[in-house]
Amino acid sequence: MDTYARVIRNTVEVVTDEELRSLLDRPVRKVYAGYEPSGEIHLGHLVTINKLIDLRDAGFEVTVLLADLHAFLNRKGTMEEVKKLAEYNRRCFEGLGLTDIKYVLGSSFQLSPEYQILVHELSQAITLNRAKRSMDEVGRQMDNPTVSQMVYPIMQMADIAMLGVDAALGGIDQRKIHMLAREYLPSKNYPSPVCIHVPILQGLDGKKMSSSQGNYISVAESEEDIRKKMKKAFCPPEVEDNPVLQVLQHHIFPRLDTVTIERPEKFGGNRTFGSYEEMEQAYAKGEIHPADLKTAVAESLITILAPVREYLK
């Protein structure tokens, strides 16, 4: 796989493709992704983690921002609580293979005078409506937002500037914030970042992934629980909006070279696949039973997540 193909695989959008190709010609290129510290790291987080590993392997200098101050502003806990979660998250990410990169705690630079002045300068230029719209996909209780939540996207823009990165990675829900950065940072003599967006995956029940619904798999989940959750997962005969196939595409094949469907000879015997595309095609033709697919995905996930479970002990 060439460098460009590795960078764009499993993405939904790059803004812009021309700028990305130009960036890949540079000897030094830097990218970042930010994470609000969370009590559970799950498959939703793993989409960007997998992409950061791709970017690292493609020659990017990778920075992970552990956004403790952002989490505090977004009502996720006290500063003390979110700092503890940030350290736990770092250990999870390292256990998932996100090593040989830089981890930065947001509060280590976001309280500096230089950073705060940039935030205030940007806030002068951006209307309240633009700030609120940019937060609609990522904020809590946005029908009645706090002033701190309006500062959140402006801080994210300042992060891109202060970290000195060429590209920003995030879920497609970050798009509006990233577009603000592309529009306004050049006016403050900072380059417009290349923006790389990955999809927001469905929960295992086919609905929006949510901690309150428990429709996700944590990276620290037991083998038994992974099998139970995957067995109950929504897996329609169609390819579209199939959460089990999404796990296969975005989590299994980026990390494993092959996946084997194990079944008795009377049902066709074992069959090994070397790519997601090959497996999706076979499933669409009815050559793989949903129950067999779910079993294979569960066992593959157990293999992939074993190192992080061991690392966290």
From Swiss-Prot:
Catalytic function, reaction form:
tRNA(Tyr) + L-tyrosine + ATP = L-tyrosyl-tRNA(Tyr) + AMP + diphosphate + H(+)
Q: Where is this motif: 'HIGH' region?
A: 37-45
What is the protein name for this chain?
Answer: Tyrosine--tRNA ligase
* Organism taxonomic ancestry: Archaea, Methanobacteriati, Methanobacteriota, Stenosarchaea group, Methanomicrobia
Cell compartment(s), UniProt = Cytoplasm
Q: Where does ATP bind?
A: S211
MF term (GO), any: ATP binding
InterPro entries given in the database record: aa-tRNA-synth_I_CS, aa-tRNA-synth_Ic, Rossmann-like_a/b/a_fold, Tyr-tRNA-ligase, Tyr-tRNA-ligase_3, Tyr-tRNA-ligase_arc/euk-type, Tyr-tRNA_synthase
Its source organism is Methanospirillum hungatei JF-1 (strain ATCC 27890 / DSM 864 / NBRC 100397 / JF-1)
